[in-house]
């Protein structure tokens, strides 16, 4: 039987929010079977739990924000991506502010935190959402067109293409494919950092955003080059970060997907729209378990590989 997974012990981190610049303490704790992934705002007078569901997403400007009532948590996608990549089903995330710390701008620090705590197999079957027919969402036309789709696939595969008119991005490749069954999330995706341009950063800061961003937690470019002294971590780091984001956005659905995800210029808003489109059509998916691990897709039967 493919079993649900949580952590063996508690893991903690301290950082700053990318947009707020505010100090944030994060505590990752084991959770019982069928809990799902739950953010707990412990800084509020009465702690508030926000459980990950597609409907919990209430804002997708610059990041994915989840909320319930008046409580929210922003920029959840990198931590959710790490949970997806390592196959964590049940987790409590205590947080002392309304934004997940950006740490190094990728998911690698979250992978380290999760793996440091250890992964515990639980006595309950892991439930998957298996896509049974193609679902697609589109926006815009011509040069502004963007789209994302999910199709049936015995496993989990993501293909992403970006379209940035910048000499550095053009030279590194704008399309990548990642298959959870044959590739390593920790090695191939997790270290890809968020990126931005100096003009954008200046504008966002004038609006009170990106206050915690800098060269230590993002790739920053001017009109011609990367400004980070160490350069890129991957040749195709830009589009790999889009895969990282997509994995986090899609894992908000609350269960691992069995599907092929394909996207062109998609972002947080379109990814969430895709999840809602899927859930709106009961004939497009089914919830499955694997009593016989040999019948499970490759890559799901083993605890996530280390670095």
Swiss-Prot record:
Zn(2+) binds at residues 78, 241, 245. Keywords: Hydrolase, Lipid A biosynthesis, Lipid biosynthesis, Lipid metabolism, Metal-binding, Zinc. It comes from the Bacteria. Its EC number is 3.5.1.108. GO terms for molecular function: metal ion binding; UDP-3-O-acyl-N-acetylglucosamine deacetylase activity. InterPro entries: Ribosomal_Su5_D2-typ_SF, UDP-acyl_GlcNac_deAcase, UDP-acyl_GlcNac_deAcase_C, UDP-acyl_N-AcGlcN_deAcase_N. Pathway: Glycolipid biosynthesis; lipid IV(A) biosynthesis; lipid IV(A) from (3R)-3-hydroxytetradecanoyl-[acyl-carrier-protein] and UDP-N-acetyl-alpha-D-glucosamine: step 2/6. Its cofactor is Zn(2+). GO terms for cellular component: membrane. Belongs to the LpxC family. HAMAP family: LpxC (MF_00388). Catalyzes the hydrolysis of UDP-3-O-myristoyl-N-acetylglucosamine to form UDP-3-O-myristoylglucosamine and acetate, the committed step in lipid A biosynthesis. This is UDP-3-O-acyl-N-acetylglucosamine deacetylase. The gene is lpxC.
